[in-house]
Amino acid sequence: MPYFKDAGEVYATIGKLFEDLASDEELAPKFRKANTIVQYRYREPESRITVKMIEGEEGQVDFGETLLEPEVVMTMEADTAHRFWLGQVNVTGALARGQMKAKGPVAKILKLVPLVKPVFPRYRRQLEDAGRRDLLEAS
């Protein structure tokens, strides 16, 4: 059974994390150096999060339909994304096993992976603060 019952829950958890990162004074400039727009297309439940990371521009996070044109598209189950933010999924391994699929210059995404490790505890705190301890037991 999926961790999230609908797209609204995906946006309230994973989406909120992206919004927080886009406005974080320390991390946002580092992510913007990727100079790309990434769209995360999730299944179970169907949802989309598009993140604009362009150096010198404001970050932008859109849920669902967007006017942004992604350069990179990452497709996976929402559960896989959730487990990634808990620190339980290795991106390279997930790509090799087909748990994640990527279109576009994947190297841009892989360069960001080292930046996200400090975000894992933030995601856990965010879930706790939202009263979603049930999501902390993902495996």
Short names for language-model regions:
Residues 1-139:
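Feature captures hydrophobic
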